[in-house]
Amino acid sequence: YEQIPKLVENAFLATEDSRFYEHSGVDFKGTARAVLVSLKGDYGSQGGSTITQQVIKNYFLSMDKTPKRKAQEIYLAYKLEQQYSKHEILEMYLNKINLGNRSYGIATAAQNYYGKELKDLTLPEVAMLAGLPKAPNNYDPTKKENVQKEKLQKPKKLRIPSKKYFTYDVFSQIARNIDG
C-alpha cells in the first residue's frame, strides 16, 4: 500500500467507490441507486459494487450475473472487511483490476500505457487510468478510434464524480490536459 501514490488512491476512490472508508464492504445506498437506474432501463451506466465487492468478484467468484452470485459477493465482502484493513483491500483491488490492453493492476497499466512507474504518473494520466474500469476497451487510450471518440464526447462526459477526493483546481487541470 505504501507504494501507491495518494493521487492514484484518490482517483480510484473518486471514480469507483467514494464512500469506501465509510461502509463495511457493501454500500447499500450505491446498490439501491444502481437497482433504480437498472429498473429505468439504463443498463450498465451505474455500478453498485464497492471496491471490496469487486475484490471478491475478481479474486474468488465467477463473473456470472446471478442473484446467487451477488448474494455470495455481498456476504464475502462483509467477511473480507472483517479480516483485512481498508488499505489492504484497496491494494488487492489496485493489483488485480482489469484496465484493458492486457493490463491487470495499476502498476502494469502505468507501464503498458505510459511506460512509467506509478510514482511518475501525471495527474491527467492518473485520471485516464481511473476512468478505465468502467469500460476498459471503450476508453483504451492506445486505440486511435477511442481517442477520437473521446474528443467528440468530452463536453458531455466531463463531470466531477467526487469532490471529497479532489479540489476544483485539480479537476480544472485534468480538463485542460484532456482538451489539449
Predicted regions mapped to residue ranges:
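Flexible, acidic/glycine-enriched loop-and-adjacent beta/alpha segments
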Residues: 1-51, 104-109, 114, 121
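Non-catalytic, structured segments within soluble enzyme domains
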Residues: 43, 47-180
